């Protein structure tokens, strides 16, 4: 990852982990373009009738997401609601659901790659609007908290699963923790777990009893792999992505 700066703060404060290096949006857009090839082949001319193409919309969405990032209790958090308005001469009224889904997926991928938290599922809407100049896009962003599908789980030795639903999750005993652990040996704000750059990470946030991954402890971020044993003070969990 090229190194991280970690700000450790008390409960209720903002937690910031800033990567020295960030991924370029071009890879995200290229991946999106490849996924869309079959979907929009022979369809793009019917749906996007003007100069605009879905790839341009994907690029705009990633840029708007970047601009929307704010610091929250778990670190950088991006908007998850995006409304795009286009001139009717650029857009067919009947946009295939597959195009919308792929636009939403490029934002999900951007968040996972850059370590952004999303407080709810990503939603993208495309609307025709006569007031928008042909060949341009108007975009509004918003935030709508909601339940996200887990991307991984922390499974306790008892078999109890703690789903990891957000790209950045606070772990601890505090009531507001994304992953609440009731053991008294776990600090109120114990650790931060997140995805970035294609990997999962965890960092101790100045807890009383420390954080270990597969027997290694550190005040710096530690990489999590499928099957990693995560120890938070006296309690242990096994990390497993849902894709496994």
Residue map of PLM features:
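Forkhead-associated
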Residues: 161-234
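Intrinsically disordered, low-complexity regions enriched in Ser/Pro/Gly/Gln/His and often acidic
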Residues: 1-2, 109
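Surface-exposed, flexible loop/turn segments at secondary-structure boundaries
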Residues: 132, 210, 238
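Short, Lys/Arg-enriched N-terminal segments with co-localized hydrophobic residues
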Residues: 2-25
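Intrinsically disordered, low-complexity acidic Ser/Thr-rich regulatory segments
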Residues: 17-28, 34-184, 194, 244
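Residue-level recognition of conserved structural "scaffold" positions that shape functional pockets
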Residues: 9-10, 19, 127, 179, ...
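Edge beta-strands of extracellular beta-sandwich domains
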Residues: 236-244
């Amino acid at each position: 990852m090229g190194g991280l700066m970690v700000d450790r703060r008390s409960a209720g404060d903002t937690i910031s982990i800033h990567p020295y290096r960030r991924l370029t949006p071009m890879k995200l857009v290229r991946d999106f373009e490849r996924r869309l090839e079959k979907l929009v082949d022979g369809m793009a001319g019917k749906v996007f009738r003007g100069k605009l193409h879905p790839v341009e919309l994907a690029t705009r969405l990633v840029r708007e997401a970047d601009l929307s990032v704010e610091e929250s209790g778990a670190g950088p958090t991006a908007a998850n609601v995006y409304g795009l308005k286009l001139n009717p001469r650029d857009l067919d009224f009947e946009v295939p659901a597959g195009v919308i889904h792929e636009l939403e997926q490029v934002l999900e991928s951007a968040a996972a790659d850059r370590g952004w938290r999303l407080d709810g599922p990503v939603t993208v809407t495309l609307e025709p609007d006569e007031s928008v100049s042909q060949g341009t896009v108007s975009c509004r962003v918003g935030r709508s908290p909601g339940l996200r599908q887990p991307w991984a789980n922390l499974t306790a030795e008892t078999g109890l699963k703690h789903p990891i639903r957000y790209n950045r999750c606070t772990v601890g005993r505090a009531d507001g923790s994304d992953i609440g652990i009731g053991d008294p040996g776990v600090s109120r704000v114990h650790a931060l777990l997140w995805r970035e750059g294609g990997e999962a990470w965890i960092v101790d946030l100045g807890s009383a009893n420390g954080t270990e991954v597969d027997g290694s402890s550190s005040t710096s971020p530690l990489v999590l792999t499928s099957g990693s044993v995560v120890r938070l003070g006296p309690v242990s969990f096994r990390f497993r992505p849902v894709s496994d």
